[in-house]
């Protein structure tokens, strides 16, 4: 009698197998849903600083922060404003007040005296020519 009782149990197991497969599929989809939620939570989590100073390919791609900073060169850190050097106050007057303004500022236009000397050197140069 034991043998006929085992046969119906095995037939019941075969009927229950598709149900167990669907429950396994439900577990798998729930696991995927949890993984998706975890990925989204990581995406919206603020980036953590990384103290790795290496710029090799492996280190550039090991976290999102390194990829932005090292791989793409994007840095969102707040840069401090540069301080201007304080202007030095002049305690003494300019040493050459008799020079013209153009010579003090380094103006490239020559004065009349310089023009005359240039013309004189051109006229006196009587080298071999045409």
From Swiss-Prot:
Gene Ontology cellular component annotations, sorted alphabetically: host cell nucleolus
Motif (Nuclear localization signal, and RNA-binding (TAR)): 78-90
UniProt entry tagged with the keyword Transcription regulation: yes
Modified residues (Phosphothreonine): 85, 89
Compositional bias segments (type: Polar residues): 11-28, 99-111
Highest taxon above the source species: Viruses
Entry keyword set: Activator, AIDS, Host nucleus, Host-virus interaction, Phosphoprotein, RNA-binding, Transcription, Transcription regulation
Molecular functions per Gene Ontology: RNA binding; RNA-binding transcription regulator activity
Region feature Cysteine-rich, mapped onto this chain: 50-66
GO biological process: positive regulation of viral transcription
Localisation: Host nucleus, Host nucleolus
InterPro entries for this protein: IV_Tat, Tat_dom_sf
Keyword Transmembrane: no
Entry PTM: The phosphorylation by CDK9 does not seem to be important for transactivation function.
Region listing for Disordered, in residue ranges: 1-29, 79-130
Residue list for modification Phosphoserine: 94
Gene3D superfamilies reported in the protein's UniProt record: Tat domain
Function: Transcriptional activator that increases RNA Pol II processivity, thereby increasing the level of full-length viral transcripts. Recognizes a hairpin structure at the 5'-LTR of the nascent viral mRNAs referred to as the transactivation responsive RNA element (TAR) and recruits the cyclin T1-CDK9 complex (P-TEFb complex) that will in turn hyperphosphorylate the RNA polymerase II to allow efficient elongation. The CDK9 component of P-TEFb and other Tat-activated kinases hyperphosphorylate the C-terminus of RNA Pol II that becomes stabilized and much more processive. Extracellular circulating Tat can be endocytosed by surrounding uninfected cells via the binding to several surface receptors. Endosomal low pH allows Tat to cross the endosome membrane to enter the cytosol and eventually further translocate into the nucleus, thereby inducing severe cell dysfunctions ranging from cell activation to cell death. Through.
Description of its domains: The Arg-rich RNA-binding region binds the TAR RNA. This region also mediates the nuclear localization.
The protein's name in its UniProt record: Protein Tat
Record lineage: Viruses, Riboviria, Pararnavirae, Artverviricota, Revtraviricetes
